[in-house]
Amino acid sequence: MLVKQYFEESISDRPLRYQTKINMVRCLKKLELWNLPYSQITPSFCWNKIEGIINQNVKGVYAGYIRNIFNYDQSQIPVVMGIARIYDLPTAEELITIIERSKYRLQLLLCMYAGLRVGEACAVVPEQIKMEKGYYFLNVDRAISQDGKSFGSPKTLGKVMIPEFLALEVLGMKKEDYWQKGIPSKRVTAACYSLSDHGSKIHINPHMLRHWFATDMARRNVPIHVIMKQMRHKNVQTAMAVYAQVNNGDLIDALPIRPTIAKENLAKVVNLFN
C-alpha cells in the first residue's frame, strides 16, 4: 500500500474540513511521502523530512499534519514552535487608499475591519448580518476553500461586531455580487500583488489586514478577552500573541536611554610655554 492509498482510505472518513485535507495532501507531496510505500513510513523518517524544511512556520504546520495523518504523538513528532511574523503596518489611510483600487475591495475591507480570513470574507452574504441592541454583528459560519470548489465551515466559528459602514455594504450586496462556487478564494491574495502603492511600495495581503485588525485593537488597549472574541481565537495564548507583535518603532521606544553626565576637570592645566 502506498501512502496516498492509506491517506484516501483512512482520512476520507475523518471529520476534517475540506481545506485541511487539501493542505494535508500538499504536505505529503512536499515532503515526498505521497508515492512511498506505507511500510517505509516511520516517525524518524518523517521527522528527517520535516527537518529539511527551512521555514520554521511551515515546519510547524507540517509536523502537526504528520502527527494527525499517521496518528503519531508529540514524543514521536515534536511540536515545532513557529516564529511570529513582524509587520511594519501602514496607517489605516494608506491601507484604504490601496484597497479602494481593488476589484476585491469588499473582501479586503472585511479582512481589515472584521478580522476575517480570506475564505471567510469571500463567502460573506447579507444574511450573515444581524443587528443587536443598535450594533451590527456578522455571523462567521461559512468559508470558501482556496481552490473554490467547496463551501464549508470556517476555521473558527463566531460572531463579530463590525462597523456600520461595512455592515451596510454587505447588506447592499446583490446576487451578482456573491462569490461564485468554483472561483478560488486565493484570487484575492494573488490580486494584492499588483496593488502595491508605487510611491511608498506598500504591499498588502488578506492575512496582513486581519493582523492589522488585531494589532489596532491591542494598541487601543482593548481587553484581551474582547480581542479573543473578535478574532475568534481558540485560546487565550493565541490572542496574547497579538501583544507580542511589535514593529521596529515599538522596539526603538523600548531602548533604554543613556544619561549624559558632564565630565569634571580633575586638574587645572597650566600652559608652560607662554
Residue ranges, per PLM feature:
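N-terminal DNA-binding recognition helix of tyrosine site-specific recombinases/integrases
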Residues: N23, C27-M81, R117-G119
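A Lys/Arg-rich helix-loop hairpin that forms a DNA/phosphate-binding surface
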Residues: M1-Q5, L16-I22, E32-E51, V80-D88, ...
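Basic, Lys/Arg- and aromatic-enriched nucleic-acid-binding interface segment
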Residues: P78-V118, C122
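Active-site-proximal segment of tyrosine recombinases
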Residues: E120-A121, H203-N205, A214, N221-H233
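C-terminal secondary-structure termini that scaffold catalytic or DNA-interacting sites
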Residues: K133, G152-E164, I257-N274
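Catalytic-site neighborhood detector that most strongly recognizes the C-terminal catalytic loop/helix
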Residues: D13, M231-P256
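Short, charged phosphate-coordinating catalytic segments
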Residues: C111-Y136, H225-V226
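Active-site/catalytic core of tyrosine-dependent DNA strand-transfer enzymes
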Residues: I162-K201, F213
